[in-house]
């Protein structure tokens, strides 16, 4: 009754008892409700007070300031800032109005994916704002659950290894044509590995997807669309109010650029589809688009956004991987010589099978690619993915629904997995590492439960390996500290064998 009296006084009720039992029962019910509310609030407050702390009460480190766009524009500096502040422990950063947990150690990656990985979600617009959502929101990389599975169902067939392997002879011809254009001199040629390789994967991926519909005219149209894409990404990264629908509605220049891209991209595909169907052309993209037809489960927006992600989002990424591959081969003559010898030995076999060589994981060819992608992963910081359950990550209590980001560059150099020489280019390190260590300690297209989910990985791997084969077979590579070609800033010298 003491509690009821206290609540009565708090609520301003008198102590009159003329209504007897009825008023007492009423006040009792009110008191019970208030007590339940207070208890629930206290329990919730207690739970929240434990969020982002260890069981001993240590609070997780938070990086000050808005780091949303810094993850892309100042990746190295932000990564170093996080390491200086938190060491190897997880930390929080602010991504616009959202908080994201950053992890960088194999055990933390294991904690993140353990038990609930199949139920992970992704934050709206990947926490990148309204314009990003209008641009790439429906793409497969931004989806999860049934929507993700639906898009994958339509896109996976042409990206399976068997489909890609059938394209190897055509890829080789295109790579040889490209080499002839970039290295026309009989003896010595120079390449700027950051520029000259930029559109090679892009071109061969386009060839793979459009097949009979791919020609010089369509390629130039795609290059023009890529320029628009770059402008839109710049708009997104420079937006002052990315989460404001009203601001983005009246931000005319970025809105106009986005609309121009969307209309041209849609019309480009509709024309290709019309021609492919009318002419009976082989065109994997047209087969994918059949999922958009009436009574099917793929929307045109999801189709176009996923095509945007596959083609345009990987242009600069693939160029960086090529730069890492060839600059390190040029700097390591012994690795280059060993790779050339391996290629020659494989090709001298009576039963030589090029797709089989490309698929093998125990070759130096594969190890060079793996080591290059360890050093140059797709993104320094991964896209956010949300925990389904409350869990401990790196000893901290992390609430359900927390967006988690992986510092990929630190993960790929961590001494726990890679020893003290993680910054040294050494393809043979993959000889010594058990596959279990790589599952949560290495990220190129994905890590943990995400390994192998990148749609274009088979095409990209094939193009990287085929290009290595063609270049190393025909040229000896040297580092070019000073370009011998006027007006060029070449960093690699190709000397004909």
Curated annotation (Swiss-Prot):
Keywords: Iron, Membrane, Metal-binding, Oxidoreductase, Transmembrane, Transmembrane helix. Residues 69-90 are annotated as: Disordered. Its cofactor is heme. Gene3D superfamilies: Cytochrome P450. One of its GO terms (biological process) is mycotoxin biosynthetic process. SUPFAM superfamilies: Cytochrome P450. The chain crosses the membrane at residues 26-46. InterPro entries: Cyt_P450 (IPR001128), Cyt_P450_sf (IPR036396), Cytochrome_P450_monoxygenase (IPR050121). Its main location: membrane. It is found in: Membrane. GO terms for cellular component: membrane. It comes from the Eukaryota. It holds the Pfam family p450. GO terms for molecular function: heme binding; iron ion binding; monooxygenase activity; oxidoreductase activity, acting on paired donors, with incorporation or reduction of molecular oxygen. Its EC number is 1.-.-.-. Pathway: Secondary metabolite biosynthesis. It is a single-pass membrane protein. PANTHER family: CYTOCHROME P450, CYTOCHROME P450 MONOOXYGENASE APDB-RELATED. Cytochrome P450 monooxygenase; part of the gene cluster that mediates the biosynthesis of oxopyrrolidines, polyketide-amino acid hybrid compounds with feature structures of tetramic acid. Does not seem to play a role in oxopyrrolidines A and B biosynthesis. May be involved in further modifications of these oxopyrrolidines. This is Cytochrome P450 monooxygenase opdB. It comes from Penicillium oxalicum (strain 114-2 / CGMCC 5302).
